[in-house]
Amino acid sequence: MQNRNTFSWVKEEMTRFISVSIMIYVITRTSISNAYPIFAQQGYENPREATGRIVCANCHLANKPVDIEVPQAVLPDTVFEAVVRIPYDMQLKQVLANGKKGALNVGAVLILPEGFELAPPDRISPELKEKMGNLSFQSYRPNKRNILVVGPVPGQKYSEIVFPILSPDPATKKDVHFLKYPIYVGGNRGRGQIYPDGSKSNNTVYNATAAGIVSRIVRKEKGGYEISIADASDGRQVVDIIPPGPELLVSEGESIKLDQPLTSNPNVGGFGQGDAEIVLQDPLRVQGLLFFLASVILAQIFLVLKKKQFEKVQLSEMNF
């Protein structure tokens, strides 16, 4: 009897463990599949196309500004900060996947020159850590450590993202040289309008797939609409499905054209990209410049002293 109770207890615990594991997997998978910039990482080997366009613009159709600030020059093996600003109106609310309104999230991709990478934690100063907040950065690919991504994160807290960057040392990396390099950045606020498979999200406008008369509009129980359009030429019925989120612009009995908007455009976000330049400076060149400036200053000082000495000699000769 005791063995039977023990077996029942073990069976119950195993069932509970498996159920919890499945729930965690489903929740995690769902959150990852809907997260920027996972889509870009899964679908593109390189986030920047040959034309210079960053692939995030394929899903985030609205064009919005983004700004990047980096030092003009850095020394080898030095940690510096790259500040990405993603401005937007903090009062705006976006349409969430369930059709409700919520705060905007932001994300960014930073494309550094080859050799530049995310600074290791032990090289980051306390001041820089405070500026970074609780952000978690990751490489776009294991073999592309110069391309960093972050997000989605709350836009109200992280509309300014600080990346800690470690510059390379040409003494240890022979493919790196003391040159001027470009840095590219892409930043989005809000959800995208198109998924990587080409399907629309509920954060975009929906157009009529046929011309005719709106014969019926059915409001679905979980939100959204089914719009039946009767083609005037052959009487064919076309049903357009509208997900929860966009506001309906048409009514029953209304005559509509092909591709006419059936809904408003709920998107309040967008994507932007920019660039900057940074110089990997040779320390010897800096030392040479300092030596040159010091020699110029000393020469000026000696010239002034010599001039004053000459004036004193002239004055004494005149007095004599």
From Swiss-Prot:
| Record flagged with keyword Chloroplast | yes
Chain segments annotated as transmembrane: 286-306
- For this protein, what does the record note about how its cofactor is bound? Binds 1 heme group covalently.
* Keywords (A to Z) from UniProt: Chloroplast, Electron transport, Heme, Iron, Membrane, Metal-binding, Photosynthesis, Plastid, Signal, Thylakoid, Transmembrane, Transmembrane helix, Transport
Cofactor(s) this protein cannot do without:
heme
Q: Name one GO cellular component term.
A: chloroplast thylakoid membrane
Q: Where is the protein situated, by its record's location annotation?
A: Plastid, Chloroplast thylakoid membrane
- Membrane topology term: Single-pass membrane protein
Report the InterPro entries cross-referenced here: Cyt-f_TM, Cyt_f, Cyt_f_lg_dom, Cyt_f_lg_dom_sf, Rudment_hybrid_motif
Can you cite a GO biological process for this protein?
photosynthesis
Which amino acid positions bind heme, per UniProt? 36, 56, 59-60
Instruction: List the Gene Ontology MF annotations in alphabetical order.
Output: electron transfer activity; heme binding; iron ion binding
Residues in the signal sequence: 1-35
Q: Which domain of life is it from?
A: Eukaryota
Q: Which family does it belong to?
A: Belongs to the cytochrome f family.
Q: How does it assemble?
A: The 4 large subunits of the cytochrome b6-f complex are cytochrome b6, subunit IV (17 kDa polypeptide, petD), cytochrome f and the Rieske protein, while the 4 small subunits are PetG, PetL, PetM and PetN. The complex functions as a dimer.
Q: State what this protein does.
A: Component of the cytochrome b6-f complex, which mediates electron transfer between photosystem II (PSII) and photosystem I (PSI), cyclic electron flow around PSI, and state transitions.
Kindly provide the name given to this protein in its UniProt entry: Cytochrome f
The species this protein belongs to is: Calycanthus floridus var. glaucus
